[in-house]
Structures are given as C-alpha cells and as structure tokens.
Amino acid sequence: MIQKKINLFLIAFLFFAQSALGDYTARNDVKEFIEFMHEKYDFEKTYLLEIFGRATHQEKVIRIMNRQPEGTMTWERYRAIMVNDSRISAGKEFINQHREDLKRAENIYGIPAEIIASIIGIETRYGRIKGNIRVIDSLSTLAFDYPRRAKFFKTQLEEFLLLSREENFNPELLEGSIAGAMGYGQFMPDSYRNYAVDFDKDGIRDILNNPVDAIGSVANFLNKKGKWKPNTPVAIKANATKEINSIKSTFKPYMTSLELEKIGLESTETIPGNLKLLPISLDLSEGYEYWIGFDNYQSISRYNRSKLYVMAVFEFSNALSEFL
C-alpha cells in the first residue's frame, strides 16, 4: 500500500514538473522575451501569449543536443552513413529531376551543381527526412531551457517569429529538426530570412516543400554567407611524410605550401596558385587520413561547422558529379 502511494506521488510529481516546464507563459524570462518582441517589432502580446501558451518543453531535444556523436565517430563510420549507395542513388534521381534548376543555380551563383545536390542530400535525403518536431517547441525549449546555447537559440526564436509574420506562416504548424532547422536544406530561421530565394518565381520563398526554391537558396547561401570562390578546390588528398603533431582546430586556411611541407604534409596533386591552405586530419579506426583544405572548405563549413560534415559533402559531391 505504501509503495502504491509512493508510485502515485512520483507520477503526480512528474506530471506537474513536466506541466511547469511546458507552461512557458508563467515564466519571467518568457514574459521578458514577449515584452522585447512587442517593443522592438510591435508583436501583439496576446498573440505571443497564445503561441507560448501552447508551446511545450521537449526533453528529447535537450537530450539529443547534449549528445555529440561526431566527437567519438571515425571518418570511416561517418562517411559510410553519409555517403553510401542508397544516398547516391537518391542523388542521381534528384539530379535527373532538377538538372536544369541545378545548372541555372550554378550559372547564377557560381556554386557547382554537385555541391548543391550534395548538401540537400546530406541534410534531408532530398526532402525525405526534414524533421517532425514543431519548430516553436524546439526553439522554445532551447531558448529557455538550454543555458549553454540560450543566447543563440533566443535569437533564432526571434528570427522564427519574424519569418512567420513576413512569410505568412502559422508558427504553430511548422516542423523541423531538433535545433529548429527547416526544409530541404535545413535552414535555421535567420538563414531562411536572409538567404532563401524564390527560385521558381512563383512569388513564394518556399524551401519547406519546394525543391526548386531549395536549390536556389542553398546556392545563394554558399555564395553570400559562404563566400564561395569559383574554380577553386574544396580539398586535395595529402600524405604524411613524417609523424604529424597536433593540427590547429580551424576551418580557415592559414598555411603556405612550404609550411605544410615543414609539418610533414605532402599534396597528392598540384596545388593551384599561391593559395592559403588548411591541414586536415581525420580520425580513422587505425591512424589518420590527411587532406589539404582550401577556401571553399571553409565555405561549406559555414553550413555546418564539422570537418566530418564538410568532407562528407565534398566526397558525396564527387560521387554525384558523374551524373551531371
């Protein structure tokens, strides 16, 4: 009997604890955010109170955000997940369907068609996996219940509400990733506002359901935010001529060819021009794989600041290039 009462108490406690987490309108930090949105952007307070009154805390968002699988994942394993026959087959189909759109984006923005197709394939398998968590829930959870990155996600929540108003979206219906990224290319709200384009000229910037707009938007992002340099490589394979000590953790090229040789890296191809170079070390199950990165390596990193991600996009793009 005592155990039964304890169990009932625990159930009730968990229920009310979860309810408190979800009752965002009762919290001072949320009230302050609502006041900020009202004062700065003239949002109606009653409207925002209704939105946040129905927003719910998503504990799984916190749980997944706290995981960092890439930190312990080898390049071999990551590449096998991201660049495989299934994804390449889907990429071939996407290219066949949107060849003209990809080429048009390449001509306008200077981004290789295979890079555009690669990013959309890596991000969502060409729209098959776009995320199924309400964006208002994920961003509210991360803005108000994830102190480590609260500042960033508060900005994204602000951008999301502005985006919804500007594009006439219902903010309670949009779904995305655990971090609030949306659509074919998984744009965060600020990227949607700043870089999404109406590439099919139908009057709507729809990267949520329109692959043509997504193609143009990914290209525009890499052109403007990525500062892509046409006719410049992403990376070239390298060999180690001696034991290499720790490599600086950065995405910005900072070395000359001579400096690379001094630390023990030798390119397997001729390096074009007098370019700044980046030594790249990828963990394998045994040893390391070495590459030399260029400015366009940094360009892709502005989409996702992970060297595994950048290299997966690059290698996948090489596989897709034969279909263009």
Task: Tell me the role of every PLM-derived stretch.
Residues A55-T56, E123-G127, A181, T241, ...:
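Solvent-exposed loop/turn segments at secondary-structure junctions
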Residues A80-S217, N223:
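Acidic/His-rich structured neighborhood in mature extracellular/periplasmic domains
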Residues D29, F36-K40, Y47-G53, K154-E175, ...:
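A contiguous strand-loop segment
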Residues D23-Q97, K103-E106:
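An acidic, Gly/Ser/Thr/Pro-rich helix-cap/linker signature
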Residues A12, A17-S19:
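N-terminal signal peptide c-region/cleavage motif recognized by signal peptidases
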